[in-house]
């Protein structure tokens, strides 16, 4: 039963790395924690701590990277907020909708609120989008690696 819960936590962690509003990598790490406490194979505390630190770092980086990319391209906080609003609205339209929604949200918010023109809004939207993709990619990679570790320690 613990193995099933650990694997389920790993899968939910991957989904949460992609979908906004769901915790991602921390849930994956909980799967490792379950196996550390009750798993069939001995896992070193060092392994659990290292993955915990990786999860903490990726969680912080996920908040910093979109802001960095947006500012790098001259965007404002409105582009960041628009990307989040567009992403959430795009969930209804599948993963493609999430990506397009994030981009369009950043573009429209930047265009409307800063009134600096379409060229600047486009640059900000590209920066916000690249930041979102980078953060999501990092979280997803870590969540997949943790799920792999869960399988290694479970079987």
Q: Which ranges hold each PLM region?
A:
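Short, amphipathic, aromatic/basic-enriched membrane-interface segments that mark the entry/exit
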Residues: 1, 15-22, 66-77, 113-119
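Short hydrophobic alpha-helical membrane-embedded segments
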Residues: 1-8, 26-27, 73-84, 120-125
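Helix-coil boundary and interhelical linker segments in multi-pass alpha-helical membrane proteins
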Residues: 1-4, 37-50, 152-155
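Transmembrane alpha-helix interface/packing and boundary motifs in multi-pass membrane proteins
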Residues: 10-27, 86-97
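Alpha-helical transmembrane segments of multi-pass membrane proteins
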Residues: 13-16, 35, 54-63, 90-94, ...
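Interfacial segments of multi-pass membrane proteins
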Residues: 27-43, 85-93, 104-113
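Helix-adjacent hinge/juxtasegments
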Residues: 46, 50-90
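C-terminal binding/interaction regions
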Residues: 113-155
């Amino acid at each position: 039963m613990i193995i099933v819960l650990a694997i389920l936590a790993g899968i939910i962690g991957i989904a949460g790395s992609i979908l906004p509003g769901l915790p991602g990598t921390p849930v994956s790490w909980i799967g490792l924690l379950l196996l550390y406490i009750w798993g069939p194979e001995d896992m070193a505390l060092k392994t659990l701590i290292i993955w915990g630190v990786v999860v903490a770092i990726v969680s912080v980086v996920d908040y910093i990277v979109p802001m960095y990319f947006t500012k790098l391209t001259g965007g404002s906080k409105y582009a960041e907020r628009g990307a989040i609003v567009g992403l959430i609205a795009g969930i209804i339209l599948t993963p493609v909708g999430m990506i397009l929604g994030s981009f369009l949200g950043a573009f429209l918010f930047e265009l409307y609120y800063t009134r600096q023109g379409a060229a600047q809004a486009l640059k900000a939207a590209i920066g916000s989008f690249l930041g979102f993709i980078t953060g999501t990619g990092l979280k997803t990679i870590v969540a997949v690696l943790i799920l792999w570790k869960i399988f290694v320690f479970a079987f």
